[in-house]
From Swiss-Prot:
UniProtKB keywords: ATP-binding, Ligase, Magnesium, Metal-binding, Nucleotide-binding, Purine biosynthesis
GO molecular function, one term: magnesium ion binding
Entry binding sites for ATP: R114, K155, S160, S161, G162, K163, G164, Q165, E195, G196, V197, V198, E203
Binding positions for N(1)-(5-phospho-beta-D-ribosyl)glycinamide per the UniProt entry: E22, L23, E82, D286, K355, R362, R363
Phylogenetic classification of the source organism: Bacteria, Pseudomonadati, Pseudomonadota, Gammaproteobacteria, Enterobacterales
Organism: Salmonella dublin (strain CT_02021853)
Protein name: Formate-dependent phosphoribosylglycinamide formyltransferase
Domain of life: Bacteria
Length: 392
């Protein structure tokens, strides 16, 4: 039984979002629909989720003392991380003191570090992954590359959105790749993972919900990546029944091993009937924004329902749908969007995130579309995104 209090009243149910970007904004909206009091926290003011929260705080979330202070002040019933760059040691301490971290502090800590989740998947669970080695010095990096072989990929163990990643084809690239990885790590210089290149037909995100009534799966989401970030996603991604079964088995093993209730974005490589584990996020996934138009319950609604202890039941997928990002390049603290009227229409929607500024390339919105098939849906979403003119 789930008891929910009313926001801003003494018995309010309080949810604190650690990370207030576009994904957190949608989680906040789902909480608001249930009358929950929302507190949004991020490292910069006026972040998207702060626009729809009851209160907000600006702190360095890697600062454990600052994180503990704001949590102690607000006394949330649920702490919901939206990003990886958080003082997870502090979250584990707070969870040990009785606070509820979504899905659990262990999952948040393991997945913020590629080494933690890779060792769990490959070495503890025995799941198929790419070949890999870890390195914490330039000399051991060279040894790792020699062991894995060319071509290979190097990534900081703590980074996101492609930061610090390089595709290495020859020894001449090693020095530059090492330096780039040291610059791109979330917590500064440090360990890297060297991965062998996996031959695959396509990548999917399998949105997997662990709830009081068991583990549930959304239809697989296909996506296209460029420069470490997704550009388009679509649902459902066509794949063989055997590959889908294997993908679901891998996802089930991973989310149950991580523990807790919530939605997980499980990233997988698919080659024919073979499926290889890549990564997992213990929270809604950017490629899953397509579910805002493709399902009766979006990934955000599913996440909230699960961590509140409510049953998920069946997930209804409406049919072929796609998302395409609005990704301008400019510098402005007063962004405007023109021609939006030409982007929307029957079966086509636009979401603008409300980010306060841009300095370079930044994802500021997403177009969503349905279609007779996923190919048509992708075309419609891309066309809608291209029609939005971003100025500043």
């Amino acid at each position: 039984m789930t008891l929910l209090g009313t926001a801003l009243r003494p018995a309010a149910t309080r949810v604190m979002l650690l990370g207030a970007g576009e994904l957190g904004k949608e989680v906040a909206i789902e909480c608001q629909r249930l009358g929950i009091e929302v507190i949004a926290v991020d490292r910069y003011p006026d972040a998207p989720a702060m626009h729809v929260a009851h209160r907000s705080h600006v702190i360095n979330m890697l600062d454990g003392e600052a994180l503990r202070h704001v949590i102690t002040e607000e006394k949330p019933h649920y702490i919901v991380p939206e990003i990886e760059a958080i003082a997870t040691d502090t979250l584990r301490e707070l969870e040990g003191e009785g606070l509820n971290v979504v899905p659990c502090a262990r999952a948040t800590q393991l997945t913020m570090n590629r080494e933690g989740i890779r060792r769990l998947a490959a070495e503890e669970l025995g799941l198929p992954t790419s070949t890999y080695r870890f390195a914490d010095s330039e000399a051991s990096f060279h040894d790792a590359v020699a062991a894995v072989g060319f071509p290979c990929i190097v990534k900081p163990v703590m980074s996101s959105s492609g930061k610090g990643q390089s595709f290495i084809r020859s020894a001449e690239q090693l020095a530059q790749a090492w330096e780039y990885a040291q610059q791109g790590g979330r917590a500064g210089a440090g360990r890297v993972i060297v991965e062998g290149v996996v031959k695959f037909d396509f990548e999917i995100t399998l949105l997997t919900v662990s709830a009081v009534d068991g583990v549930h799966f959304c239809a697989p989401v296909g996506h296209r990546q460029q420069d470490g970030d997704y550009r388009e996603s679509w649902q459902p991604q066509q794949m063989s029944e055997l590959a889908l079964k294997r993908a679901q088995e891998i996802a089930r093993h991973v989310v149950l091993a991580l523990g807790g209730h919530g939605l997980f974005g499980v990233e997988l490589f698919v080659c024919g009937d073979e499926v290889i584990f890549s990564e997992v996020s213990p929270r809604p996934h950017d490629t899953g924004m397509v579910t805002l138009i493709s399902q009766d319950l979006s990934e955000f609604a599913l996440h909230v329902r699960a961590f509140l202890g409510m049953p998920v039941g069946a997930i209804r997928q409406y049919g072929p749908a796609a998302s395409a990002v609005i990704l301008p390049q400019l510098t402005s603290q007063n962004v405007t969007f023109d021609n939006v009227h030409a982007a929307v229409g029957a079966g086509v929607q636009v979401r603008l995130f409300g980010k306060p500024e841009i300095d370079g390339t930044r994802r500021l919105g997403v177009a969503l579309a349905t279609g007779e098939n996923v190919e048509e849906a992708v075309i419609r979403a891309k066309k809608a995104a291209s029609r939005v003119t971003v100025k500043g």
